[in-house]
Regions:
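Short aromatic-enriched loop/helix-cap "lid" or pocket-rim segments at secondary-structure transitions
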Residues: 26-27, 126-131, 188-192, 256-258, ...
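Active-site neighborhood of phospho(di)ester-bond hydrolases with catalytic His/Asp-centered motifs
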Residues: 58, 86, 118, 179, ...
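Active-site gating/metal-coordination segments in enzymes
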Residues: 5-158, 162-165
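Aromatic-lined glycan-binding groove of carbohydrate-active enzymes
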Residues: 115, 119-124, 163-213, 217
Length: 305
């Protein structure tokens, strides 16, 4: 909370614990279910109560067991302070547009809870049996290369596969955010997917809309990095309501305590757009209540400095 004050963050939506990036790769589905439920209870009972207005949580669900994941989603929907549930970009190398995951999407749609896709870098695993894999990781000899590629590539693959396999058409009220991979790739990826749908139409039988239409719809959102100088162009091409600020606190590549200031000073990002990206989009996306937003804005004080 002290660091949030220094950074200028009124409300934080938190992806918590290293368990989040590995639990969906466990071969033992029962263990995965128990770990997800344990972390979720810890969030609700111990972590978020430190300041229930300012701290919001992203719950974990065992996606390798879609029925159990749907049950855990129903549990999360009843917990104060949980505003989303996390999806991996793949489970055992199986992409998230696969229909085996439909029970998760159906439940998320029914309870009105947005899902948040978070990428990963590792490649340990065996297709169809265990592991959550990072695209290209097995070919990279340095972590710098792995991190630079896998996070963004995994989000691109997850978005493409969920669009192409008709997830957003089968579940028209489903909301999914793609996080921690930047936003600068969106205009390029939307154009490329449109081209491939147009020229290879028989391979997209389940898709009822152009990929760019889905990317610009209220069904999907993305997070940006505070240093993305192309952000104004992204908002022009994809839409102002699609992108939310993310601090990436407290990873090695975060800009703490200057990320809010950095984003606010991006050339071409006017005051209205700053307000939208820094707060309004997240308030709408995560269904935050007005009474949960502090009256005396920490961000306002920081930006005034």
């Amino acid at each position: 909370l002290k660091d949030m004050d220094e950074e200028g963050i009124d409300v934080a939506v938190i992806f918590g614990t290293p368990v989040a990036l590995t639990v969906n790769g466990l071969a033992d589905k029962g263990l995965a279910q128990a770990m997800c439920h344990g972390v979720n209870r810890w969030l609700v009972e111990e972590y978020l109560p430190a300041d229930s207005k300012r701290l919001k949580g992203v719950g974990l669900i065992p996606c390798q067991d879609p029925a159990a994941a749907a049950t855990e989603l129903e549990f999360l929907a009843k917990q104060a302070g949980i505003v989303s549930a996390m999806l991996p970009t793949n489970v055992y190398g199986i992409n998230m547009g696969d229909r085996r995951f439909d029970p998760i999407y159906a439940t998320a749609q029914d309870i009105g809870m947005p899902l948040s896709v978070h990428p990963q870098t590792g490649h340990d695993g065996e297709y169809g049996r265990w592991g959550v894999m990072g695209a290209g990781s097995e070919r990279m000899e340095k972590y710098a290369y792995v991190h630079a590629t896998a996070f963004t590539f995994e989000l691109q693959i997850a978005l493409m596969h969920m669009i192409g396999e008709g997830v957003f058409d089968r579940f028209p009220r489903l909301k999914v955010a793609y996080t921690e991979g930047g936003a600068g790739w969106l205009p390029f990826w939307a154009e490329r997917l449109d081209e491939h749908q147009e020229k290879l139409r028989p391979q997209w039988p389940d898709l009822q809309r152009r990929p760019s239409e889905i990317i610009a719809s209220e069904q999907v959102a993305f997070t940006c990095e505070p240093e993305e100088r192309t952000l104004p162009y992204v908002l022009d091409r994809v839409g102002e309501t699609q992108v939310m600020y993310a601090s990436d606190y407290a990873h090695w590549d975060c800009e703490f305590p200057n990320s809010v200031r950095m984003l606010s000073r991006i050339e071409g990002l006017d005051e209205r757009r700053r307000s939208v990206v820094l707060g309004q989009n997240a308030i709408h996306w995560f269904n935050l209540k007005p009474e949960d937003i502090p009256a005396a804005s920490v961000a306002g004080r920081v930006l005034a400095v």
